[in-house]
Amino acid sequence: MRRKVLRDFVIGVLLLFVLPLAELSVAIAQESVFTVQQPDFQKSPYTGMTRQHWIQAGEYLLKGAFGYIHTLDDQMYFPKQLDKTYPNNDGQVPVAKLEGLARTLFIAAPLLKDNPELVMNGIRVADYYRHQLVGISNPKSPSFIPHRKGGPSQTLLELGSLAISMKAAQAVLWDPLTKAQKDSLAATMLSYGEGPTIGSNWMFFNVFILSFLKDQGYAVNESYLESNLKKLLARYRGEGWYNDAPAYDYYSAWAYQTYGPIWAEMFGKKQFPQLAQQFLANQHDMVANYPYMFSRDGKMNMWGRSICYRFAATAPLSLWEYDKSSDVNYGWIRRIASSTLLQFLENPKFLEEGVPTMGFYGPFAPAVQIYSCRG
């Protein structure tokens, strides 16, 4: 069980895209650089990082975001950094707030699974996220998201991300909601999950919404779910690499080779076992080459789109456990994951006012896209 919680936490931290930053009237003190307290070089000869240090790293990151949260109604919405990023108008603000909620929950969910009583900045973290989830479908809430109107949008991605976290910490985030609250939230999610998408990694977010709600007993468009899964698998090009319409970069890792195996483990083995097995087989193809994308000391290159996602590039490594293969050097991949995490957390430019910057180390416009948001 402890190993599973560690794996789930590793997934949560590695799936972190980039935390948002909020403008407050009261300035927040600059966070100190993360340090590994009492490293254990017997268990981890190179980094000293153990399970407990990974938990501390997650709390360190989440603490910065919660420095801006003082009530359950406060939203994870922060001023943009760099002109090219979004939001660029008032119409984009609601989804920017939703992105802040969804992306920070990628860290909070595994922490809550390990410690449901977690408190940050005087706020019970579980209460905060449940309150925000309920607010998504409440027209009177500042967190309200209306049902879909029109084509695919960023809202689809964030609701799909929430579905992952709600499954990962279901006993804390989803189960305590009333039936009416669940039904209302499900209706909002379905309006996007069953709606149009883009033929890239975006299809995963339709998949997670539909699979999660199917798992909870809701009627979903199963043919659309299966169709998106098959289209995602069709983008596989061999040796562990997917083509993301049309790019080859770390998206193959932090999207296809992360979301695919997570879907297989969370839902696929029960819902579509043959498709789940194919995702896991494709995952294993990475073992022979992907670790060599990192340096001898376990650090990553600045390569590809959305590089401000940073250590999300190591996300597939912790998921190789799903395959139960004997040819995986788990010590090596743990060393890579820990070294890449520390590559950023130990860099003094990584944080500004407690949260990550929009860049690789510090703010750096060439490392972000127009769809990048401090969320």
Protein language model regions, located:
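Extended polysaccharide-engagement surfaces of secreted carbohydrate-active enzymes
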Residues: L319-G375
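Sec/Tat signal peptide C-region and signal peptidase I cleavage site
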Residues: S25-I28
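Low-complexity, Ser/Thr/Pro/Gly-enriched N-terminal "stalk/linker" regions
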Residues: Q30-G100, R124-Q132
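Bacterial N-terminal signal peptides that target proteins for export
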Residues: R2-V13
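Bacterial N-terminal signal peptides
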Residues: I11-E23
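Aromatic-lined, polymer-binding surfaces characteristic
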Residues: K97-L98, F106-L111, G122-E321
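Short amphipathic alpha-helical segments enriched in leucine
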Residues: F66, H70, L105-K113
